[in-house]
Amino acid sequence: MTEEQKREIENMLNKYSRRKAFAEEELDEDMRCLYESKINDIFEIIKIMGHEVKCAGMVKLPNKEYKYFLYSII
């Protein structure tokens, strides 16, 4: 992996990550597939970087809105 690729991954992680929970957004139905794809990409990158990934997925809130989440131990 080149230094540029490492910086790109670090920037992506910094953009989406907090210590415990991150990448949490409410999205309309049209955006679900796109966002799930993004979460899966981030999930894989975090594993490649050697961090322990706890959970990734989607929850349906009581008001029927969807919330996406990704938990990681960094």
Enumerate the language-model features and the residues they cover:
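Short intrinsically disordered, low-complexity segments
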Residues: 6, 25-27, 39, 60
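Charged, low-complexity interaction regions
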Residues: 21-33
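Acidic, low-complexity, intrinsically disordered interaction modules
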Residues: 32-63
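Short hydrophobic transmembrane-like helices used for membrane targeting/insertion
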Residues: 42, 73-74
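Non-transmembrane amphipathic alpha-helical segments
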Residues: 16-23, 42
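Short amphipathic alpha-helical heptad-repeat segments
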Residues: 2-18, 35
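Short linear proline/tyrosine/threonine-rich motifs used for host-factor recruitment
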Residues: 58-60, 66-73
